[in-house]
A protein has these predicted regions:
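Gly/Pro-rich hinge or "lid" segments in bacterial periplasmic/extracellular proteins
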Residues: 170-227, 231, 241, 348-353, ...
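Surface-exposed binding/hinge segments that line
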Residues: 8, 102, 136-180, 203-204
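Ligand-site clamp/hinge motif
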Residues: 188, 218-265, 280, 384, ...
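Structural transition elements
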Residues: 200, 325-363, 382-390
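N-terminal lobe/hinge region of extracytoplasmic solute-binding protein
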Residues: 44-94, 125, 195
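Detector for C-terminal structural segments
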Residues: 8, 16-20, 33, 209, ...
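Extracellular/periplasmic solute-recognition and catalytic clefts
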Residues: 127, 144-146, 203-213, 235-293, ...
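Aromatic- and charge-enriched surface segment that lines or borders ligand/interaction sites
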Residues: 88-133, 148, 154-156, 246, ...
Length: 543
């Protein structure tokens, strides 16, 4: 199950506009204080480190440190838009195949060496190594890269691919310090003593914590040239609950990745804010339309299912309401969201009316609707994780109320991915999906993706949607691309091969002693550090 711009739950999310960000606590950046340099910020994190190399980073700690220490040619800003980072500028030619990046002249590694095109070539070469199978494996597949000068690099794609800019957010590695191939990368001392280009650098690592110190020549903070905090300490805990206990005792300043059940406890802590950061992680019910015998072959049945499910209640059961109801492939805060598409408001009465009108009625009076001798029943396959299982049971209850019999088939997550999803061994599949910051629905709805390793779990495709999805991938202009997406969203909303249910939030608790944190959507947990160079603990009186 792969996709060019995603990680698997499947993993890599549509672009989010910040104007609608929902937070339990608001930004604290507007308080009447001015930031001052100094101070140590301590955050509790679940897990322990294996490698800080961004290509090898696997644990929560690895990924957090990697985000603080390294940077890429581009990055996502607060609103989810791709902007230049290590690059000063970038452009794409009219064909959509040739992308050219100019590296900013003031970008340096922590050892003072300049960032050059050689670093880009080296990093891309590692990601293109056949032995590498990590989350960035698809980012540069089939892409050729060349250095036009020490500061200019050019990527040539086999075909136009509008979301390619998102691939260039991949953190760069220093070619002057690492000359080994991918197979030897894991044995390098560099992995726990990395040299990067980010606002902080690793100072010390022990069994209890990793300490990072400020880089005094960080290009993105110029003209002040450095972050406000002196140090960031990431302290290791067994799990999120233990880290939350440390926050309650005042041992750390923040912790994240909290469960909805933790939210109530956070509210009892004095001087602590709870932030609910939107993500593009959505949960959906894919309806398998492949079999000619499937009840899902009838579009009215699919529309009735979408109408009968109380998404708000499903969200409450699965995530204590921490998130938002989903209506389409991207959230309402995305540039790709289209308001003018068919939506299915929860209504048991309307769902019953749809089924009655299509002659799906209880002819044999056994409590289950049927038509032509076929009972309206199916099984939902999902993971045995409590939140997902709770969602499945709530859906089953909603559908039972309109005369549809639903069984819940819960299996371990590994089995769900490797056997059930990949082999398409299900009637309906309830899963969580993460898509790239620049949305690409192609892997989920194109005819070429109906079998593994594609992600078209429903088996849905039409000639029209195929052409639209192909054209959207080739269209760099965002406005034109949105128009193409609008047609795709309308087709999916009408045909209902999948019922979008809800988006989840990332819960982050932080002491009010820290200032400068700004609420933003997070594509992944480390993205909470998106403006860490502006965080501060010390203040001076405003003049």
């Amino acid at each position: 199950m792969t996709g060019r711009d995603k990680l698997i739950v499947l993993a890599l999310v549509g672009i989010l506009a910040i104007t609608s960000v929902v937070a339990i606590a608001s930004d604290r950046s507007d308080l009447p204080t001015d930031p001052a340099f100094g101070g140590t910020y301590v955050e509790g994190v679940a897990g322990s480190p294996l490698s800080f190399d961004p290509i090898l980073a696997a644990t929560n700690v690895d990924q957090d440190v990697s985000r603080l220490v390294f940077s890429g040619l581009t990055r996502f800003d607060r609103g989810g838009t791709i902007v230049a980072d290590l690059a000063s500028t970038f452009e794409v030619d009219p064909s959509g195949r040739i992308w050219t990046f100019t590296i900013r002249p003031d970008a340096t590694w922590h050892d003072g060496a300049p960032v050059t095109a050689d670093d880009v070539l080296y990093t891309v070469g590692l990601l293109q190594d056949k032995a590498y199978r990590g989350p960035f494996a698809d980012a540069f597949r089939g892409v050729s890269v060349a250095a036009l000068s020490p500061q200019i690099v050019r990527f040539t794609l086999p075909d136009a691919y509008a979301p390619f800019a998102g691939s260039t957010t991949v953190p760069l590695l220093p070619s002057h310090l690492l000359s080994v191939g991918f197979n030897d990368l894991a044995r390098q001392p560099f992995n726990l003593r990395p040299i990067g280009t980010g606002p902080f650098k690793v100072s010390d690592v022990d069994s209890r914590q990793v300490t990072l110190v400020r880089s005094d020549d960080f290009y993105r903070t110029k003209p002040r040239s450095r972050a406000y905090l002196d140090k960031i300490v990431l302290r290791f805990y067994r799990d999120e609950a233990e880290a939350l206990g440390a926050l309650a005792r005042g041992e750390v300043d923040a912790t994240g990745g909290l469960s909805p059940q933790d939210a109530g406890r956070v509210r009892t802590l004095k001087g602590v804010d709870l932030f609910s950061l939107p993500t593009n992680d959505f949960t959906a019910l894919f309806l398998n339309v492949r079999s000619t015998k499937s009840v899902f072959r009838d579009r009215v049945v699919r529309q009735a299912i979408a109408t009968a499910i109380d998404r708000g209640k499903v969200l409450q059961v699965a995530a204590d309401g921490r998130g938002s109801v989903a209506d389409e492939f991207v959230p309402s805060t995305s540039w790709a969201f289209v308001r003018d598409v068919p939506r299915y408001a929860f209504s048991t009465a309307d769902a019953r009316a749809l089924l009655d009108g299509a002659d799906w009625v209880d002819h044999d009076f056994d409590g289950v609707r049927d038509k032509g001798g076929v009972a309206l029943k199916f099984a939902i396959a999902t993971s045995d994780e409590p939140a997902r299982l709770g969602a499945a049971r709530q859906i089953a209850d909603d559908l039972t109320a309109v005369g549809i019999r639903v069984d819940v088939r819960a299996v371990p997550f590994a089995d769900l991915v490797d056997r059930v999803a990949r082999q398409r061994d299900f009637d309906a599949l309830l899963v969580g999906i993460t898509v790239g910051n620049d949305p690409d629905p192609y892997p989920f709805f194109h005819s070429s993706q109906v079998n593994d390793p594609g992600d078209d779990f429903s088996g849905y495709s039409t000639l029209i949607t195929d052409r639209l999805l192909e054209q959207a991938r080739r269209t760099v202009d965002q406005g034109m691309r949105r128009e193409l997406f609008a047609q795709v969203w309308n087709a999916i909303a009408t045909d209902v091969p999948v019922v979008f249910l809800y988006y989840t939030d990332y819960l982050y608790a932080q002491s009010r002693t820290l200032q400068g944190f700004r609420v933003a959507p997070v594509n992944d947990p480390p993205q909470r550090f998106w403006n860490v160079e502006d965080w501060y603990l010390k203040t001076v009186v405003r003049q």
